[in-house]
Amino acid sequence: MIKVKKNNFFLNEEIKRYLNSIIKKNSYANGYIFYGAEGVGKKETALEFITEIFKQSSSSGTIEERITNNNHPDFLIIEPNSTLEAKISKNSDLEKTTKSGSEIIKIAQIRNIKTFLSQKSINSEKKIVLI
């Protein structure tokens, strides 16, 4: 069950009940959007939700650690790079970027999602991507 963690104090009871009901029913949508102001715990809530989903199909005690370390074979996290770190090269499709504010996600990262999702799940029934 999803619990309110110390660093995630904005997770209100209604959201917690909704996410827990999804887990109980084992009825998942193809995608979820966690939105809100910066610093309210969207990523932490999403990671906790993903951990609970994987716990439904596996009894391994290391799921939480593997999710946190982005080391689960059925989980992929895609994070934007800051514009200062990104290098745009006109010669390579891999370096073309999609801009979003001050951060970018490379096209190669999006292609990686496609490859990842086309492969069979290894440790669970689901494959999950967090962007």
Predicted regions and their residues:
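Clamp-loader machinery-focused feature within the broader ASCE/P-loop NTPase space
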Residues: I2-I131
